[in-house]
């Protein structure tokens, strides 16, 4: 039974990772070609391009680690630490980029008059590069905190100092743990807030357009409905992912193999699922994907 569960989780993780790698590589290629041709790139595409690169590296690293685990009975402690830190940094960066992308969508589409919202509206598009760098720095800082926390937790509860006095490190551990949890909690609250505001604003706009039936379905309304669907599907994927990622690491969860397997599958399904959502709701990416699908269908039809 355990072997069957392990094989199922392993196969599902490999499939999800492979799909995610292909989807993000597709985003990278299409946006980079458009960037080279036009010599300019929009703020949303710049964030999307950075997110695709980060996820491509994350999923590639995760796939390599999965293959390594399957083909090696013993694991190096240094390799495990290196993999965990790289994954922590890339995963944190991708989540902050998603938060940034949701923020950009929210301030561009919605029309709220709150001072904080108006400040975001003025600064987000103008300082995209600086905010992308901020995402990197925050991710590096939280990864460093995580590394320090894991190193401190290896020491005894009380450590003897140079002057032969005892000092308790539990306060430091709690502080670092609180910093990491608050960072994840901040991401979660921001993403849910931006997505909820966007869904609320778009729903009001669509209802308003429905009352004016003569101009109900136009390209702008279609784009708004697509953005609303994207945010709803994003929340459906993101909320279970956040819960599963939070529950995966505690020691008591490691004793429940079924719960741990469910958490692993949910966390593996989120990155490729969200990447596919971004493709099908992005006009250029969706058009290019349709062309590729039509090409392969035509080729199969001719070959048959």
UniProtKB/Swiss-Prot annotation:
Topological domain ranges for the Extracellular compartment: 1-10, 68-80, 150-171, 251-260
Cytoplasmic topological domain: 32-46, 102-128, 193-229, 282-304
Tissue: Expressed in tongue, stomach and duodenum.
A single cellular component GO annotation: membrane
Membrane-protein topology: Multi-pass membrane protein
Function: Gustducin-coupled receptor implicated in the perception of bitter compounds in the oral cavity and the gastrointestinal tract. Signals through PLCB2 and the calcium-regulated cation channel TRPM5. In airway epithelial cells, binding of denatonium increases the intracellular calcium ion concentration and stimulates ciliary beat frequency.
Miscellaneous section: Several bitter taste receptors are expressed in a single taste receptor cell.
Descriptive protein name: Taste receptor type 2 member 4
Organism name: Rattus norvegicus (Rat)
């Amino acid at each position: 039974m355990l072997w069957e569960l392990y094989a199922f989780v392993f196969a599902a993780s490999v499939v999800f990772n492979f799909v995610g790698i292909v989807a993000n590589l597709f985003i990278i290629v299409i946006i980079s070609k458009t960037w080279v041709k036009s010599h300019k790139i929009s703020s949303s595409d710049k964030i999307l391009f950075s997110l695709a690169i980060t996820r491509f590296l994350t999923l590639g690293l995760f796939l390599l680690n999965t293959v390594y685990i399957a083909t090696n009975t013993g694991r190096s402690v240094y390799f495990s630490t290196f993999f965990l830190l790289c994954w922590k940094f890339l995963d944190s960066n991708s989540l902050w980029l998603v938060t940034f992308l949701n923020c950009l969508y929210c301030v561009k589409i919605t029309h709220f008059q709150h001072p904080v919202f108006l400040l975001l509206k003025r600064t987000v598009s103008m300082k995209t590069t600086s905010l992308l760098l901020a995402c990197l720095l925050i991710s590096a800082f939280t990864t460093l905190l995580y590394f320090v926390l894991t190193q401190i937790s290896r020491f005894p509860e009380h450590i003897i100092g140079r002057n032969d006095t005892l000092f308790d490190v539990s306060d430091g551990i709690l502080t670092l743990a609180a910093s990491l949890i608050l960072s994840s909690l901040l991401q979660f609250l921001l993403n849910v807030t931006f997505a909820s505001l966007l869904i609320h604003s778009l729903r009001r706009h669509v209802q308003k357009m429905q009352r004016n039936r003569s101009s109900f379905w136009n390209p702008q309304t279609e784009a708004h409905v697509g953005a609303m669907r994207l945010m709803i599907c994003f929340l459906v994927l993101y909320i279970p992912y956040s819960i599963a990622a939070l529950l995966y690491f505690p020691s008591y969860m490691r004793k429940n193999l079924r719960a741990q397997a469910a958490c692993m599958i949910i966390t593996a399904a989120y990155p490729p699922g969200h990447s596919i959502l971004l493709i099908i709701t992005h006009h250029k990416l969706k058009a290019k994907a349709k062309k590729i699908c039509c090409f392969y269908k035509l080729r199969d039809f001719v070959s048959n």
